[in-house]
Amino acid sequence: MSSEKPKPHLNKTWYVILFIFALSLFSSVFLSTVYYILAPFEERAAIFDRDQQMLTAAHVLDFSGKFQIYEEGSWQPAVYDKKSHLLKVADQHAPVVTSSVLDAYTQGFVRPLLADKLGQMFSFEEKNINVTEFIEKHQNGHFYQQPLLLFYVILANTEQARAMSAADVIKNPSVVRAIIIPISGFGLWGPIYGYLAVENNGDTVLGTAWYQQAETPGLGANIANPQWQKQFYGKKIFLQAAAGNTDFATTPLGLEVIKGSVQSAFGTTPKALSSIDGISGATLTCNGVTEAYAQSLAPYRNLLISFAKLNQRDHNGSK
């Protein structure tokens, strides 16, 4: 009975080194190929998540990822009509929005714009700036530190508004239904990035959302919890005076996440309108969120004031 002769070279040092090198090379090439194939999908998923968070902050989406529309004094489930390209009140339960439908809505009703510190608005085309490159360049930093400030507007749910270019919107800002400002700062463990959506009066909060944060689960990470985010709806980013009036030019601007309950601390005073209940055990994260709102919103003051004045003129004109 014959037996296979041993292969002495298998125990040689050079063979072991060669084998390890070949295995490492194969693994490196394999992982690089997988990354190259999956990178576009990961990027699209990240864009979808940011868009979803933005529209959730603006109350276009509810917290379950379904369209909603403000009709007859309340938010009602809605669907995206692919023929008219408008949102319509749902006859039955609204479906969860898919990536393709979200893209269609965003292209039709969301416009990225620029503003200077004086509140003057510009389109990216007017400034000869590529919007994709601008966002990619600054998205891991602070948009509020740039000479030209990025913001988004949500347009009215009409065919006329949908057909308007960014330049058209600037000429006719009355079609704007919401203003979305990028928010960035630092939590306990690292950077936090999100959005704050404001009504077209430049003051009343629609909502907030965070698309990137690494806070402690169950504690600071609750800034991304819908139950905590719901309390932002209806808050005011310009602090009202005790008499109930607002001096937009001089009053503090921002939202303060306090320690404890707003009701216990401020009751029904104007301060309560610009304050948010804190998160137990996450004081440092809450302080970081407060600072993020203050720093991110400050350069946009004149832009927000311009919308407040426009809203007041429209309100007076409709009387």
Swiss-Prot record:
Residue(s) carrying FMN phosphoryl threonine: 283
Superkingdom: Bacteria
Molecular function terms from GO: FMN binding; oxidoreductase activity, acting on NAD(P)H, quinone or similar compound as acceptor
Gene Ontology biological-process annotations: sodium ion transport
Segments crossing the lipid bilayer: 14-34
Membrane topology summary: Single-pass membrane protein
Reactions catalysed according to its record: a ubiquinone + n Na(+)(in) + NADH + H(+) = a ubiquinol + n Na(+)(out) + NAD(+)
UniProt EC number: 7.2.1.1
Function: NQR complex catalyzes the reduction of ubiquinone-1 to ubiquinol by two successive reactions, coupled with the transport of Na(+) ions from the cytoplasm to the periplasm. NqrA to NqrE are probably involved in the second step, the conversion of ubisemiquinone to ubiquinol.
Family affiliation: Belongs to the NqrC family.
Protein's name in the database: Na(+)-translocating NADH-quinone reductase subunit C
